Design a protein with these regions (language model features):
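Residue-level signal for well-ordered alpha-helical positions
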Residues: 49, 89-92, 136-137
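A short helix-to-beta-strand connector/capping loop
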Residues: 53-60, 99-100, 118, 143
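Conserved phosphate-coordination/catalytic loops
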Residues: 14-17, 100-107, 128
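A short acidic-Thr-Gly-centered motif at the start of a beta-strand
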Residues: 1-5, 111-114
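Glycine-rich adenosyl-binding loop in Rossmann-like folds that engage adenosine-containing cofactors
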Residues: 67-111, 116, 184-185, 189-200
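Conserved acidic-Pro-Pro-aromatic motif
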Residues: 10, 22, 29-32, 111-283
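SAM cofactor-binding core of SAM-dependent methyltransferases
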Residues: 2-72, 151-153
Length: 287
């Protein structure tokens, strides 16, 4: 895929932009930022907050539900009544009464990137849907230099390491972003500066993230030890030329290698046992 509208400009996609707290940082890192957010109320807030950047054509706000479906015009979206960060595209299974169902315009991954151009960095943070969008993105041969996704599902890491062909990784812990990355040195399009990331923002990406890049095996062992949760997995390809090439047919072997190791790990076995005991106790209580 090549950009049809923005040439070789550096484009960042903020997929799951929420209230736009990541946008100021991304504007410092790119020529254009595409903020994708389904919640229309949050989009209105961003339009007011970043009116100047929108007018300068540095920021585009896409009010749509990003989906992996090929043909879609309108899709249901579930807005949490009190915590907007919990709003989601898949129908909620936990306390659905806390959500308001609305129908919003849908857009596919292909449509989004075809309209705005090839990405330099993609942040994916869509509640319970990161791995679906990531798979669609990689299946369409979209492999930006830098990419990140939230690790509530191990499939995010596995897809990056197999189908994505990425071989260098870092982790950003969401709970510590505001403290760890306060007055943090970052590189921008105009040089180096110090920046403080707000609470509940995604934090830095790429070379701005603390620590050395590690290989897939090292990161996998960290996830086995520390578990998943509120943390973003960041990835890049050490050899950018190889990133442009499609992964070999052996990527499926790599996928199942990590998938099965995760499923049979002691932590996952313990989790399944706890789940079984919890369900059993609920049945006993109900009589």
């Amino acid at each position: 895929m090549t950009s049809i509208t923005n040439g070789n400009k550096k484009i960042i996609y903020d997929i799951g932009a929420n209230n736009g707290d990541d946008v100021p940082y991304y504007l410092k890192k790119a020529d254009i930022v595409i903020a994708v957010e389904a919640n229309p109320i949050l989009c209105e807030q961003m339009q007011k907050r970043f009116a100047l950047e929108i007018e300068q054509q540095k920021l585009v706000i896409e009010n749509c539900v990003l989906t992996a479906a090929n043909e879609v015009t309108s899709v249901p979206f579930y807005i949490h009544k009190t915590k907007h960060v919990l709003s989601q595209f898949p129908a909620p299974t936990h306390k659905p009464e806390n959500y308001e169902k609305v129908f919003l315009p849908g857009k596919t991954v292909n449509q989004l990137f075809y309209e705005h151009g090839y990405p330099y960095y993609v942040k994916i943070d869509i509640e319970h849907y990161d791995h679906v969008i990531l798979r669609s993105l990689l299946n369409n041969d979209i492999r930006p230099k830098y990419i990140s996704g939230e690790s509530h599902s191990i499939e995010v890491f596995i897809l990056l390491a197999s189908l994505g062909n990425y071989d260098a990784f870092k982790i950003v812990n969401g709970s510590s972003v505001a403290t760890k990355y306060h007055n943090w040195p970052i590189s921008t399009t105009t040089g180096e500066e110090v920046y403080s990331f707000p609470y509940h923002s995604a934090g830095p990406f790429g070379e701005d993230v603390a620590g050395e890049w590690v290989n897939s095996e090292s990161l996998f062992r960290t996830l086995l030890s520390d578990g998943l949760g509120w943390k973003d997995i960041h990835a890049k390809k050490q050899d950018e030329y190889m990133l442009a090439r499609r992964p070999s047919v052996l990527w499926r072997i790599r996928y199942w290698y990590y998938f099965l190791r995760w499923k049979i790990s002691p932590s996952q076995r313990l989790k399944r046992i706890r789940g079984f005991l919890y369900k059993a106790s609920k049945k006993v209580i109900k009589g």
